[in-house]
Swiss-Prot record:
Organism: Mus musculus
Positions that bind ATP: 192-200, 215
Protein name: G protein-coupled receptor kinase 5
Function text: Serine/threonine kinase that phosphorylates preferentially the activated forms of a variety of G-protein-coupled receptors (GPCRs). Such receptor phosphorylation initiates beta-arrestin-mediated receptor desensitization, internalization, and signaling events leading to their down-regulation. Phosphorylates a variety of GPCRs, including adrenergic receptors, muscarinic acetylcholine receptors (more specifically Gi-coupled M2/M4 subtypes), dopamine receptors and opioid receptors.
Subunit: Interacts with ST13 (via the C-terminus 303-319 AA). Interacts with TP53/p53. Interacts with HTR4 (via C-terminus 330-346 AA); this interaction is promoted by 5-HT (serotonin). Interacts with HDAC5. Interacts with GIT1.
Amino acid sequence: MELENIVANTVLLKAREGGGGKRKGKSKKWKEILKFPHISQCEDLRRTIDRDYYSLCDKQPIGRLLFRQFCETRPGLECYIQFLDLVAEYEITPDENLGAKGKEIMTKYLTPKSPVFIAQVGQDLVSQTEKKLLQSPCKELFSACAQSVHDYLKGDPFHEYLDSMYFDRFLQWKWLERQPVTKNTFRQYRVLGKGGFGEVCACQVRATGKMYACKRLEKKRIKKRKGESMALNEKQILEKVNSQFVVNLAYAYETKDALCLVLTIMNGGDLKFHIYNMGNPGFEEERALFYAAEILCGLEDLHRENTVYRDLKPENILLDDYGHIRISDLGLAVKIPEGDLIRGRVGTVGYMAPEVLNNQRYGLSPDYWGLGCLIYEMIEGQSPFRGRKEKVKREEVDRRVLETEEVYSSKFSEEAKSICNMLLTKDSKQRLGCQEEGAAEVKRHPFFRNMNFKRLEAGMLDPPFVPDPRAVYCKDVLDIEQFSTVKGVNLDHTDDDFYSKFSTGSVPIPWQNEMIETECFKELNVFGPNGTLSPDLNRSQPPEPPKKGLFHRLFRRQHQSNSKSSPTPKTSCNHRINSNHINSNSTGSS
């Protein structure tokens, strides 16, 4: 039994390390899998793609890189890209250096005498920006200037880009992105845990070598529990939220027996494990603060989509290889209709907000209560309304949430005590974060006084703890309880509409990020010499014929050999014998 677990872990660790070869986990045929189509095959895509500047040139990672390459080949446009880069750099500059960095931008790009002066930013706006820089520089100082540059770029430069070989190449990448996804797209590894409808296992994309977690939802189990809307809801929310602090959905596909969500893999274990199984319960405040800041950023990204998470607890916060966290398991998350409130008594005992327990209507407020519970538990080493391993009825825990105040030990600084107290306010209208400003109000609390959120969001701050890369932070394979067989449920054609809505293939932004991170983009995104067209982009050059299979090559070679033979009856007989022999062998090996 122990041997089986060791083997499963060893295979997984080798895959995580890239297999130990030069291809870093990529298939031998990865270039064939990601071979660009001839541009003539992309005409339908060209006609139907949404020609929105922000979508094509800013939001989509490969689109952004290709538009950048286009601008760098136009001397008059290169300075605009450099300006936007410097503004992005300014926004993550430490506060004490903002003044100097701001002056650098003003001098280089917003001074008329400069050789790279950007005239598209109006003089009135330049004057206002300069005045603010002298008074009190802030992170958003150049936002309006950057918007002016985007307003210019989305005009003539964008339309020129749409007629360039760089946009043609983008269409080729989109064609690859939209290819069917099946179980053969991946290699499967050990089971990592269980979800509500099936197992979660590690997997690896054959073409790129990138590791993911595959959440299998068994079709019969979904149907038996009438979980179709819940499963589709989670998939659609994951698809829309693009956040480095929430697990990303990269692929959604189906097999004969299951629906599969391919998600960011988090190899560092969950917060519950780290709070209770790594020395004394709880964290030092500095570590708790870092995780709280990243959780807050994840909530902010969800709330931006008007989505309330409703299940904040340590088990649902996962660590990656580097020690950064992501919110996982969006099964209870729900999108709130614009201008409306919802009702629903869902969540985990001890973490549900008073308004949820009382079945009142609510918006985003339960998530700020959940954040308060998490900060408290990370510092204290137990949840605010239930002792560690305390045996107590659900009704008693609910009563404590509604009627009692949490107790603070000497582990809490004044700032930590204050933020927990304000987040755990029982009246949601008075709770921190539940006013118009939302997460921005929480970020301004003194607890986060020394946290640079711009640098955090840019991934520039080092986590306080890095997981051991040689460890597998999950239960032994045989300790993960297996699901029983679902009986008495039959799948039929009436389920197909649901499956088609679920199985939509690759998700654009995560897929494009995968191509960039695994260096597939760098290696494949090659044009002709001196900025000329590559053969696959040349409309006057016909596409290469598809490669013939082994059987075709063998048969053709035999046919050519026989054509050279003398047409005597004896040779003709030998021809028939040889031809049959070749066919027999070919069929046997196919």
